[in-house]
Amino acid sequence: MKAIKRLGFPYETQDPFLFCVYHKDDYPAGDDKMQAPRQGNGADFDWSQPYRMYHGERIPGLPQRPHRGFETLTTTLEGRVDHTDSMGCGGRYGDGDLQWMTAGSGIVHGEMFPLVHRDRPNPLKLFQIWLNLPAKHKMVAPAFVMHWSERIPKVQSQGASVTVFAGEFQGATGLSPPPNSWAADPANDVAVWYIALDAGKSITLPVSKLGAQAKRSLYLTNGAGVEVGSRAMEKGFFAELRADKTAEIKAGSAGKVASAAG
């Protein structure tokens, strides 16, 4: 363990990661146009409310905006995302799917959160993580890959589950990233894991292939708190871990954490 720090917005990250946010919105039932009951104000990030419109007007989300020189990983846990981009691509994904996009020389894309259910709420839970590109690949052509939930590896043990969005965990290897990604080189040992623990259960994070050179972050997103080794970490905090040593994560109440390393 290196340090435990308070979470901000966006989450603090370590190289090669540039940015991380966790969206948790309790959207109500939508109307016949998949809209929310209220209109957005153009920049709705009010965390005191049950849900946010972000930059959307009637459908919440993040309309068209430019990216260049890095990658975005949109890891969905619950809810739907509508993707459109300047390459002419578009589609809907969610409920455990991962979109991994290489912005490269530049792309404009939008991610909206349609309220697809008219007869029940539309909860949304997802992470968006930005991963730097190697210098030699900064200006490659933009591209993306879709990893569908049913194909994403999951490790199950008694009272614990790990979704392997990237990297390797206990013999399970994540699906292939885009070819120009920092994560495409196994020597970089990039990993993104989503971990769910029942109350009182634990799991041990392995040593990185990079040893002390790797930088590993652990974000607590749900639950009152966890023990990281011998130290307690409450909700609203994250840990910078030593990657050259194993780390036992134990939940007091049921908890969910995300780990990013590289």
Q: Model-flagged regions — what are they?
A:
Residues 1-262:
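Jelly-roll (double-stranded beta-helix
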